[in-house]
């Protein structure tokens, strides 16, 4: 099976599974927007590649795909729920929390209409530091400059869960960006 056909099947499955808002427009008038992440990350080019493949054969299926740079996983899920995005790339842990109404999604409740269409890649949580930083464990991050991720991103959400578990907040670090 060609890659294009594979992604067409994925997009069709998403459209048929209720991920998009229902409309009464004709096939020639269907538009799909994929929420991704920052333009320098992995999610944005992934969404762009999917849209290029979908748009390549747009004349036969009548769907036009566009990609939107966003804040990332948590933002994408919230925006899909609000009906402002059709599809979005999200870390699986944040999809799990949204579906079950836990963590950052507790106030909004379970989002049981949310569906996974495909997986891009595994996303382990990794902390790295320069060899000369003196950092050998998580406790050593206190008082250091730490990238905690962009607001709305899965990285930021995961870091906030970790900070809460450790009893930390942004003031724990010399600089939290």
Model-derived segments and their meaning:
Residues 5, 14, 84, 145:
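Conserved functional loop/turn residues at catalytic and ligand-binding sites
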Residues 15-25:
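C-terminal segment of classical bacterial N-terminal signal peptides
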Residues 1-11:
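Bacterial N-terminal signal peptides that target proteins for export
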Residues 51-53, 66-108, 135:
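Pocket-flanking alpha-helical
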């Amino acid at each position: 099976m060609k890659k294009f056909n594979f992604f067409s099947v994925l997009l069709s499955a998403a459209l048929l599974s209720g991920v998009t808002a229902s409309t009464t427009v004709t096939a020639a008038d269907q538009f799909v927007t994929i929420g991704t992440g920052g333009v320098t990350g992995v999610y944005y080019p992934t969404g762009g590649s999917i849209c290029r493949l979908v748009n390549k054969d747009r004349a036969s299926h009548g769907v036009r795909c566009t990609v939107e740079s966003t804040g990332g996983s948590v933002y994408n899920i919230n925006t899909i729920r609000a009906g402002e995005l059709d599809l979005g790339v999200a870390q699986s842990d944040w999809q799990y929390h949204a579906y079950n109404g836990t963590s950052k999604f507790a106030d909004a409740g379970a989002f049981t209409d949310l569906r996974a269409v495909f997986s891009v890649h595994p996303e382990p949580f990794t902390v790295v530091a320069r060899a000369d930083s003196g950092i050998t464990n998580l406790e050593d991050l206190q008082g250091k400059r730490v990238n905690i991720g962009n607001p709305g991103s899965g990285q930021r959400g995961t870091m906030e869960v970790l900070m809460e578990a450790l009893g930390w907040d942004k003031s724990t670090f010399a600089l939290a960006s």
